[in-house]
């Protein structure tokens, strides 16, 4: 039997909202596999679907930089929140986002890019910062959105300085319509994305493995029912799932009586033409990163006592 720790139970409770004893049972039944335990609880009807599992533990900052029809977002991680409040660190993250506007490619391309008017690359500057501050830092990821017509709207949540915060969102709206109106609408949708964390724009953007996983959970929860009934249950369940995790089908946070898709359709009159939500990017600081927890205070004292 796997060694089930209190930390594992706590982690599972945070992911699922299930009771402590149910979480312990799930971990015992799945030999301590957290993701399998999430599915076990859901099959038993003891947990809600987790759109994106994973503890968020890394420090650092997310930055966005916009230039009308194109915008970029970057995430730079540090070991401590203390460094994230450092002026030099914040300046680096902000400048890296500006460079990302014109860099083609992912992290490696951005690291190799030069700061404007300088022979120093982004990677070199980061190494200098590490040496100066004395803490490890990582340029973790970067993304960019561009439209030929329309706007790229941005939003930063938990902002610590202009364009810097814990969550950064880009939203691409393609339209020949009024730019001022599109910018306002785009920002509202970006705020929605920050709040709801959709998996994809629509159902076609969800990978097949995720769909199969949801289908299997629905089948096992309704095992024993006739095949034709089960097929309808799975179909209905997936439709509900898509409404929960796809941006266009989600209830709009600013007016939950409408979906985002309906809001876009109604916006065409004010915009003066069709409005298409072409894409979005949402970066949450530390998303999917697990940071090792240090020993508790009692353990530290015991270790020190041993010499």
Swiss-Prot record:
Q: Where does it localize?
A: Cytoplasm
Signal peptide (residue range): none
Which molecular function GO terms apply here? translation elongation factor activity
The protein's matches in CDD domains, at most eight in alphabetical order, are given as: UBA_EF-Ts
Task: Read off the Pfam families from this record.
Answer: EF_TS (PF00889)
The principal location of this protein is cytoplasm
Q: Which keywords does UniProt give here?
A: Cytoplasm, Elongation factor, Protein biosynthesis
| Matches recorded under InterPro entries | EF-Ts_dimer_sf, Transl_elong_EFTs/EF1B, Transl_elong_EFTs/EF1B_dimer, Transl_elong_Ts_CS, UBA-like_sf
SUPFAM superfamilies xrefs = Elongation factor Ts (EF-Ts), dimerisation domain (SSF54713), UBA-like (SSF46934)
Stretches the record annotates as Involved in Mg(2+) ion dislocation from EF-Tu:
80-83
The terms describing its cellular component in GO are: cytoplasm
Q: Which family does it belong to?
A: Belongs to the EF-Ts family.
**Summary of the function given for this chain in its UniProt record:** Associates with the EF-Tu.GDP complex and induces the exchange of GDP to GTP. It remains bound to the aminoacyl-tRNA.EF-Tu.GTP complex up to the GTP hydrolysis stage on the ribosome.
What protein name is recorded for this chain? Elongation factor Ts
Instruction: Record the organism.
Output: Methylobacterium nodulans (strain LMG 21967 / CNCM I-2342 / ORS 2060)
């Amino acid at each position: 039997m796997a060694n089930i720790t209190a930390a594992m139970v706590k982690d599972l409770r945070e992911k699922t909202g299930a009771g402590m004893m149910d979480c312990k049972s799930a971990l015992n039944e799945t030999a301590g596999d957290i993701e399998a335990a999430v599915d076990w609880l859901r099959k038993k009807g003891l947990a809600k679907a987790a759109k994106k599992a994973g503890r968020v533990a890394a420090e650092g900052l997310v930055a966005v930089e916009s230039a009308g029809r194109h915008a970029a977002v970057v995430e730079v991680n540090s070991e401590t929140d203390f460094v994230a409040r450092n002026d030099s660190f914040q300046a680096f993250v902000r400048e890296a986002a500006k460079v990302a506007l014109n860099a083609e490619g992912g992290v490696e391309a951005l690291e190799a890019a030069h700061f404007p008017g300088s022979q120093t690359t982004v990677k070199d500057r980061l190494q200098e910062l590490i040496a100066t501050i004395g803490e490890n830092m990582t340029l973790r990821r970067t993304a960019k959105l561009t439209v030929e017509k329309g706007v790229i709207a941005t939003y930063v949540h938990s902002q610590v300085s202009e364009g810097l915060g814990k969550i950064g969102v880009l939203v691409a709206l393609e339209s020949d319509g009024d730019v001022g109106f599109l910018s306002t609408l785009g920002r509202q949708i970006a705020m929605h994305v920050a709040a709801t964390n959709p998996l994809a724009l629509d159902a076609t953007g969800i990978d097949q493995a995720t769909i199969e996983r949801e289908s299997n959970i629905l089948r096992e929860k309704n095992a024993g029912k006739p095949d034709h009934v089960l097929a309808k249950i799975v179909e209905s369940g997936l439709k509900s799932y898509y409404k929960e995790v796809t941006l266009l089908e989600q209830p709009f946070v600013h007016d939950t009586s409408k979906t985002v898709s309906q809001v876009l359709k109604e916006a065409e009159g004010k915009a003066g033409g069709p409005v298409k939500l072409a894409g979005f990017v949402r970066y949450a600081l530390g998303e999917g990163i697990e940071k090792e927890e240090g020993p508790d205070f009692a353990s530290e004292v015991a270790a020190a006592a041993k010499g």
